[in-house]
Curated annotation (Swiss-Prot):
The keyword RNA-binding does not apply. Pathway: Bacterial outer membrane biogenesis; LPS O-antigen biosynthesis. This is O-antigen chain rhamnosyltransferase WbaN. SUPFAM superfamilies: Nucleotide-diphospho-sugar transferases. It comes from Salmonella anatum. Its EC number is 2.4.1.377. Belongs to the glycosyltransferase 2 family.
Length: 315
């Protein structure tokens, strides 16, 4: 049976949710050859709880954390394996064969990455419920260069909240970008598609993972998304923008709320405006003072080592 490494970045995971994570993990029918926790100096019981299940715990300072570089660092310390699975501390396995199912799509030798389905947490608000249902459907998909014309940027949709990679391809393509504000998963998926590989979405492998973000938090998250695309313009150049998908999302959200939670419509409209404004400002981050970028961003420490460049590429 092919071997795989499971990597989980953590920071103050919270006793109840972290114990729930391990309870679901222990039920998995397919267990990793190695579980690696890379922790950003948590001040709660995160490491103590994890030490019950693994000796492979790497501790870094909070300022060292980066969505790409931190995951690369964890994998660099891993034993040999065929695949690597990344999960977040708040993504709880929903079915006991989730790992088995996500790895099964690698039976196609041309598949280089797979992401699983994300269901809303049981305490998710209506906006979070709709977002998960919209973005994570019930049908498994395998995507290649041939799908770019129809799917556009959705071709390279990937989420490291629950994703698996063929390690040989991942490493051959250089791993995640070392310094990225977010979307290291989309970056790698795009590189894989460009290199002629396929990426997949496995609807049968599911976790519960969602966030009840406020409009302010959505503004921050979309500001960071705009920064990412400004710094990596080749992704939208080669795969297209998300404008049409955004309009489809808003239409679907309003229809969902009219049927299920009409009093949430004003909140949804405010959130949509916050997302739009945040994204547009993020796309033009180099026109803003660095202090303003840090204030607008959800990922504050990212801005500690930024240099401006005329090409808008992060150096």
């Amino acid at each position: 049976m092919p071997s795989f490494t499971l990597i989980v970045p953590t920071y103050n995971a919270g006793t109840a949710r972290w114990n729930e994570w391990f309870h679901a993990f222990q039920k998995q029918t397919n267990q990793p050859s190695q579980l690696i926790i890379i922790d950003s100096s948590s001040t709660d019981d995160t490491r103590n709880i994890a030490s019950t299940y693994t000796n492979n715990i790497i501790v870094i300072s909070p300022s060292e954390f980066n969505h790409g570089g931190t995951r690369n660092k964890a994998l660099a310390s891993a034993e040999e394996s065929d695949f690597v699975v990344f999960l977040t501390q708040d993504a709880i396995f929903e079915n006991k064969n989730a790992l088995e199912e996500i790895l099964s799509l690698f039976n196609d030798k041309n598949v280089a990455a797979v992401c699983g389905r994300q269901l809303p947490h049981h305490d998710a608000n209506p906006l979070a419920i709709h977002a998960r249902n919209f973005n994570y459907g019930t049908e498994t998909l395998i995507k290649s260069k041939n799908d770019i014309k129809n799917l556009g940027i959705k071709t390279v949709f990937m989420s490291n909240s629950f994703a698996a990679y063929r390690r040989s391809v991942f490493e051959a393509l250089g791993g995640f970008p070392e310094h990225t504000i977010l979307a290291e998963d989309m970056f790698m998926a795009a590189r894989m598609i460009q290199a002629g590989y396929k990426i997949a979405y496995c609807a049968e492998a599911s976790v519960r993972h969602s966030h009840n973000y406020t409009p302010r938090q959505e503004f921050q998250r979309y500001f960071d998304t705009g920064v990412f695309h400004a710094c990596n313009p080749w992704i939208q150049r080669d795969f297209g923008g998300a404008g049409g998908e955004g309009f489809r999302f808003v239409k679907s959200e309003i229809q969902f709320l009219l049927k299920n939670a009409p009093f949430w419509i004003p909140r949804a409209l405010l959130t949509t405006f916050a997302k739009f404004l945040g994204y547009k400002l993020g796309k033009h981050w180099q026109s803003l003072p660095l202090s303003t970028c840090r204030y607008f961003s959800m990922y504050k420490s990212y801005w500690n080592n930024i240099q401006y460049s005329s090409s808008k590429e992060i150096k």
